[in-house]
């Protein structure tokens, strides 16, 4: 079963959606979100988080609203508080092969399947349900509305940022640690100068125009 709220307006991340699911009899509720749909390089990372119901987690909100330092602090807090955390990764090759939407859903599915405590209900950021036979609700801008989704957004974002910092060491000159693969001016200039790296998404505009120019092996 999938229910989509198309007209939801953002508000501070709270327990409202989890409470509604609990009143309907669901007991193991996971929030799902991703990071990295838009970049020109690197993977898309999804996270699934099950929190102890009603736990006070001050500051947990949409990861995009938080500073990197605050995200790191909350990442540690969530890791120490959550009942279960699952992470899924779809790399640049998967993205190029099946497209970014399908890669995102595959990463979300992997994140849910990695949970040590199988959920009976999913709260999913966005409008596309996770391809699993689990009751779920998709919520536009859910990372600002559901604390479970907000927690997942932080786990996904910090995990991906750390992966991109590692790639920065493997492929110097592109600035991956700074822009995380997004199409900043400095990133576009690096692609023009160096050609695509081995982790660039070759089907994305801004990269495919430079195929065959790579100086990185």
From Swiss-Prot:
Catalyses which reaction? Answer: Endonucleolytic cleavage to 5'-phosphomonoester
Which keywords, in A-to-Z order, does the entry hold?
Answer: Cytoplasm, Endonuclease, Hydrolase, Manganese, Metal-binding, Nuclease
Q: Note the InterPro entries from the entry.
A: RNase_HII, RNase_HII/HIII, RNase_HII/HIII_dom, RNaseH-like_sf, RNaseH_sf
Where would you find this protein in the cell? Cytoplasm
Q: How is the cofactor bound?
A: Manganese or magnesium. Binds 1 divalent metal ion per monomer in the absence of substrate. May bind a second metal ion after substrate binding.
Q: Which cofactor does it need?
A: Mn(2+); Mg(2+)
Any idea where the RNase H type-2 domain is? 27-216
The catalytic activity of this protein is classed by the Enzyme Commission as: 3.1.26.4
One GO CC annotation = cytoplasm
Query: Is the keyword Metal-binding assigned to this protein?
Result: yes
Tell me if Transmembrane is a UniProt keyword of this record.
no
The residues listed in the UniProt record as binding a divalent metal cation, with positions renumbered to this chain, are 33-34, 125
Give GO MF terms, alphabetically.
manganese ion binding; RNA binding; RNA-DNA hybrid ribonuclease activity
Per UniProt, the enzyme's principal EC class comes to: hydrolase
Q: Which GO terms describe its biological process?
A: DNA replication, removal of RNA primer; mismatch repair
Superkingdom as given in the UniProt entry: Bacteria
Q: Which cysteines are joined by disulfide bonds?
A: none
Q: Sum up the protein's function in the record's words.
A: Endonuclease that specifically degrades the RNA of RNA-DNA hybrids.
As for family, the record states: Belongs to the RNase HII family.
State what protein this is by name: Ribonuclease HII
